[in-house]
């Protein structure tokens, strides 16, 4: 990481392996590690089953957790409200259930990002901004295709300030850059 100063990383937690938390503890001490990434589908576990273990750890470290919630979007709200000192980014702005999760988080600690195909749906970015504002939407924190995502925001029918929030200001604030 020292040879690439502009590159930041996530530490992946696979909660079925207790050693994952030891590794995460060490990696979170590095300023280049921006938070924790979980992917329940790929690691074959349920957020409901392992959420307390993961999010209590995240709260203890005041960590940002990037989540691929799949069908468990509603679970995120419960955990975000139970562990308010952690911050939650649901990858791939997905639609109404994501927007409702962000609205229903009591502490304003749930965000989404614009990565992936879901945010390419017609007018989803505009709809999300109209429902929750631009302050809890991040530009592609989990994308492999920044160019297509960038165009999606640049040409969205939202204010210049909303675009700047999504592209820059929200990440700077959240990741303390």
Where are these regions (language model features)?
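Alpha-helical elements of Rossmann-like donor-binding domains used by nucleotide-donor carbohydrate transfer enzymes
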Residues: 26, 53, 124-127, 148-152, ...
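Short, conserved catalytic or adaptor-binding loops enriched in Gly and charged residues
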Residues: 1-2, 104, 131, 157
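Conserved, mostly hydrophobic/aromatic
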Residues: 27, 36, 58, 92, ...
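Short beta->alpha linker loops
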Residues: 15, 70-71, 144
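Small/polar glycine-rich anion-binding or flexible loop at a beta-alpha turn
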Residues: 119, 142-146
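Mid-to-C-terminal alpha-helical segments outside catalytic/metal-binding sites
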Residues: 134-136, 146-177
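Catalytic pocket-lining loop regions of alpha/beta-barrel enzymes
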Residues: 34, 47-138
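Active-site gating/metal-coordination segments in enzymes
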Residues: 1-64
